[in-house]
Amino acid sequence: MTLQQPDAIEVRGARVHNLKDIDIDIPLGKLVGIAGVSGSGKSSLALGVLYAEGSRRYLEALSTYTRRRLTQAEHAQVDEVLHVPAALALHQRPSVPGVRSTFGTMTELNNSLRLLFSRCAHHVCPHCGARVEPSLNVAAGLSLTCPSCGREFYAPDAESLAFNSGGACPTCGGTGVMREVDEASLVPDESKTINEGAVLPWGTLMWDLMKQVAGEMGVRTDVPFNQLTAHERDIVFHGPAVKKHILYVPKNGEGATPLDFTYYNAVYTVENALAKVKDDKGLKRVARFLREGPCRDCGGTRLSEVARQPQVCGINLAQAAAMTLGEAIEWVRGVPATLPTEMQPMAADICDSFLSTARRLVDLGLDYLALDRAGATLSTGERQRVQLARVVRNRSTGVLYVLDEPSIGLHPANVDGLVGVMRDLVADGNTVVVVDHDTRVLTEADYLVEMGPVAGAGGGNVIAAGSVDEVERAQASRIAPFLRTDPKRVRPQVADDEMFDQGHIRMATGAIHTVKPLKVDIPRGRLVAVTGVSGSGKTTLVLETLIPALKAQAAGERLPSHVRWVDAEGIARANLIDATPIGANVRSTVATYADIHDELRRAFARTPEAKAAGYKAGAFSYNTGALRCPTCDGTGSISLDVQFLPDVEIVCPACRGSRYAEAASHIHREGKDGSLLTLPQLMDMSVDEALDATVGLKKVQTRLQTLHDLGLGYLTLGEPTPALSGGEAQRLKLASEMGRVQDDAVFVFDEPTIGLHPLDVQVLLAVFDGLVAKGATVIVIEHDLDLIRNADYVIDMGPGGGDAGGQIVCAGTPDDIAACAKSITGRYL
């Protein structure tokens, strides 16, 4: 008798987050797409059920001793999940790597390069400096003999060539950058006297009395700084640390105090403050006086002089790492043929390991990135594709891969490569579940599951499931109308001759990263999309150039060194609205972030019951108030420490997640229909429900209406903000900006359609319209064709990525871009 192999993961009774006790079969060995509007339960099904159960069961198969050293998942809220394979998840937002991470280290390409330069290089004799021919002795762990001086030495191993260990530059510690005091920033206004605060660090980083000490040093403190002699200026910037006797008079003029005080010159004041920095806040205070540049010893390569000595084909490791991936592939292919015959098989093995890793990265459109590019400067989409390439390289089988929006940051031209990589995973015998909104990804799925019909409490149901054709025919489907249609325009088009009616924002830049020197002209008071393939320079142009330049001009500070000039008269604010999570812990909720909770606390403190009990507004705070739950301290949950098992996070049994003590349920406020509501009940309502329940509270109503208009009506007031999706976080950050006059503001959104269903994109466009109607200039970095089609003006970067990009290919209306033969974006519009 032959046992029939299971052909599907059977999910029964799933209740994670907003899932409504759903039953669904997910085909095994297929590419499965999960669609649905934001907040409909897609990630709850994919990550909260499939991944959570797949990874938990795999870990449970390990020994107790091993499990104690791993972060473990708790049981998902589901009756049964059958036939689920071991699972791996690629999350929507991989963490930003630290300062020591580069594209080469993240992809492990550096490992192959270091091995190549250790085993196959011409090494330098440490005794006489002569070069020694490549030899198999290095791989065998034997010494090399110098042909010039005859002495023996050992070649560096691969670890000795790593900038994170033995090969690090001693000056910068392997980071490649040095922070130095920028003397020009110490005295920005030389028309002021020292007494008037000309020397900024003495006023912001040091006691004000340093002005008096400078006077005792022989510096005139009552004349404009630009009239000081060269000797006096030298004392201000570089004077010696000597003790001086001063009579300190406090600002209130009471009681002069004699003091002996050591003189700290302006440069040392900054250096001393930098040495004492303990957190980002402290660094921010000092950063304005610092200039960051390449390390003077290693030239930014991160490597020590010894690590830069071995050469392969005439170049060293630093020069190889400076190549783009595309260039490095060509170079690596040619290496084995240049070596002695007996070394070629070993070199070929090392080179093959590099090339097999590189091939996946090229498929995902990352060939434009230099291997030494700092990991922190990679975009979200680039980091996610690096993560995906690492997974595919393993060639494992029988695994469930859950991908959360892998199309983030992916230009339409790169979608085919992404689909190809997912198909390779399926071909290796794996199951791929992909949560995405990109219809070009969804239409490639073998099986499609659509969640909905709406977000939040009204969602959590399977409204369609089957092949793409079957979902298209499903009456209840909300994605069906978008699956095979071209992007449509829903906003009125601004006439060409009216585009710049409200003014210009102009800027000229020098070269930076892959961006060539260029001039850009942006219409004010319009919705402007910055487009282009990955690596074309969009992020560099907008986030690293335009925003810092506008902020510097508004603050009257020096422009970034690569910005030649900027003309943006009347712009006082440049706001980046990104998708990073809001708040660091569960104490931050939608109500507290949107400034609704304080108003609600005051409203409940005015009730007769609160007055009778002696409760003021502060008592209703779930963080510090008298009415917070004493069991969970107002977090709504408690963590149980179970030895040998993972800590179990459970809803607080005392307050049942409301965060409040029992006494809070005795304080009522009358609602619209005469019903009595408590604050815990209100916090458990959605924004839309609370709109009806808070009639009469004008400020609360205004803020709730704003959240509704932002498409966030389904969020509950007590929902922790760190749990919000990227798109939800972005829109919530806008809440405080809506309704204000914005003609002095520029709002920049980095891929605001992340996590948005095509229907949600239409809501987002309405939000942008609201900002533009108030005079704001809205700039979006975007790949989503629906949003690009609806922009007033498009600036298309390219034509390619990396060195093949960095230029403005064309600028104009979406129709102009579509008609531009050189624009890759235009082909898809």
What are the functions of these language-model segments?
Residues 1-829:
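Conserved phosphate-binding elements of NTP-dependent enzyme cores
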